[in-house]
Amino acid sequence: MGRGRVQLKRIENKINRQVTFSKRRSGLLKKAHEISVLCDAEVGLIVFSTKGKLFEYANDSCMERLLERYERYSFAERQLVPTDHTSPGSWTLEHAKLKARLEVLQRNQKHYVGEDLESLNMKELQNLEHQLDSALKHIRSRKNQLMHESISVLQKQDRALQEQNNQLSKKVKEREKEVAQQNQWDQQNHEINSSTFVLPQQLDSPHLGEAYQNTNVVDNGEVEGGNSSQQQGAANNTVMPQWMLRHLNG
């Protein structure tokens, strides 16, 4: 006799239910992989266990891209076929979709920081490693770009500061030269102002009349040829300047 058809209903035994879930889950993931390879189809599979543990499969290991494509397709379908978004059923479905997407994003975020890796198989771990390596390459490339830009900015600032320093040094030297010249001029002016020039004053004035008499000096130092009154008068005779003589003669 052939094997009878199994009736589809909830397995009451907890252990049998877990064993069946594990077997059917593996078979389902295998079938999803086979159809993606054989038919070159994009397949995304999401399974939650009774304990809320997530199991998924994506042929290109990018469930986010598949979900985004699904959202775009669903949005386009909703645009073509108007639906009543005010009904409780539509809001419940939309909430379930957003919740599932949020859980996927949270799970992937944990995977990126090295958490909750027990549920991943070898291929999924390799794909995650490849994604992290690619992300690190982009991060290093961006970091190197920022470093080169910072170095370029610092070099420009250094050249500008050197040019400014050269200009300031040139101005200081010019100022020192001007101060030295000014000090030299001030010293020369001070020497000129402090010097006195004595001009000899020689007045060639004629005598008014016979001011003096010839005297003979004897051996004992006495003066002959005149009395004391004549000598006193000779001493009082004044040498007259030329301009006074002109007034007197006029």
UniProtKB/Swiss-Prot annotation:
One of its GO terms (biological process) is regulation of transcription by RNA polymerase II. It is found in: Nucleus. Its main location: nucleus. Abundant in vegetative organs. GO terms for cellular component: nucleus. Residues 88-178 form the K-box domain. SMART domains: MADS. Keywords: DNA-binding, Nucleus, Transcription, Transcription regulation. Residues 3-57 form the MADS-box domain. The keyword Transcription applies. It comes from the Eukaryota. One of its GO terms (molecular function) is RNA polymerase II cis-regulatory region sequence-specific DNA binding. Pfam families: K-box (PF01486), SRF-TF (PF00319). PANTHER family: SERUM RESPONSE FACTOR HOMOLOG. Probable transcription factor. This is Agamous-like MADS-box protein AGL8 homolog.
